């Protein structure tokens, strides 16, 4: 028996077809399938034209952004139209993250990518979900909010002037074009999140410079950049903890020790900023970070095979 697993965001969907022995028969990508944004025809066209499988699956598990409780029947109906002989299930990307990270164990599952989300999970169901609210009102710790904090810092002087010039040169943008991207162009959240790789690169360059560069002034400038950015990222993750994770810890039954709950993360931001993330959760708040994954597919395959 084969199982088709999908992990879908708004921009792309990752697919994997596996057999009961755990052998991966197919992996591929299609456009993102978000039922909140796409019509039935749009979704059916993606499934019919972009997904070519070597064999028909017996089971389909689709995890996606936009798959709310009210959207589940519609998404499952569309999947059933494409795979009429299969047992089909559609669930939220958050439940997918919890299953990938924690399996059938209880804990706190977090997504830190372009956006942010989290939940308290009992090993089967999501018990609590702090509303993420999006990058304008919330999404603390996300790539979009890191980008927002960075731009605020370089233009208001909280971050070094040399870092501002470095970013403008790296991005090929100036102040008016940045304002245009944020306030007048669509998908500002994706632009803001695209700054995260620059932040990560700057934080790592100081180690490379210290090892290979004899220019002490250059090394000192890089160190200044790295320290300022590290502090900013720690602040972002601290806000994520305080505003999203604290409610779960407060809700845990008094007979349980909240600090015994493990916390796990999936997403590019969690992956690339693992050190400051662990600093906040393990050193500052004494929680156990059990796992950090860049993407959930490996964990989802393991979950559905065991």
Regions found by a protein language model. Give the residues of each.
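Glycine-rich beta-strand-to-loop/alpha-helix junction loops that act as flexible
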Residues: 63-68, 112-115, 261-270
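Glycine-rich phosphate-binding loop of actin/hexokinase-like ATP-binding domains
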Residues: 105-155
């Amino acid at each position: 028996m084969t199982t088709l697993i999908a992990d879908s965001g708004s921009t792309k969907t990752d697919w994997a077809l596996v057999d009961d022995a755990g052998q991966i028969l197919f992996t591929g990508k299609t456009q993102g399938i978000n039922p909140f944004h796409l019509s039935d025809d749009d979704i059916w066209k993606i499934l019919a034209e972009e997904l070519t499988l070597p064999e028909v699956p017996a089971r389909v598990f689709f995890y996606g952004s936009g798959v709310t409780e009210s959207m589940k029947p519609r998404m499952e109906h569309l999947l059933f139209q494409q795979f009429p002989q299969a047992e089909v299930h559609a669930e939220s990307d958050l439940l997918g993250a919890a299953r990938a990270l924690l399996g059938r164990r209880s804990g706190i599952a977090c997504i830190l990518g372009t956006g942010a989300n989290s939940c308290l999970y009992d090993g089967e169901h999501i018990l609590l979900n702090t509303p993420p609210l999006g990058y304008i009102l919330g999404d603390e710790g996300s790539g979009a909010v890191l980008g927002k904090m960075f731009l605020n810092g370089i233009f208001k002087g909280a971050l070094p002037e040399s870092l501002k010039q470095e970013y403008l040169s790296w991005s090929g943008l100036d102040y008016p074009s940045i304002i245009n991207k944020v306030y007048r162009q669509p998908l500002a959240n994706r632009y803001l999140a695209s700054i995260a790789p620059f932040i990560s690169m700057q934080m790592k360059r100081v180690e490379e410079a210290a090892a290979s560069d004899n220019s002490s002034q250059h090394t000192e400038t890089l160190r200044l950049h790295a320290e300022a950015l590290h502090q900013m990222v720690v602040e972002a993750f601290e806000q994520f903890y305080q505003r999203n994770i604290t409610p779960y810890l407060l809700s845990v039954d008094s007979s349980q020790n909240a600090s015994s709950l493990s916390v796990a993360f999936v997403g590019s931001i969690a992956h690339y900023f693992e050190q400051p993330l662990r600093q906040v959760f393990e050193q500052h708040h004494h929680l156990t970070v059990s796992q950090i994954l860049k993407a959930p597919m490996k964990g989802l395959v393991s979950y559905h095979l065991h």
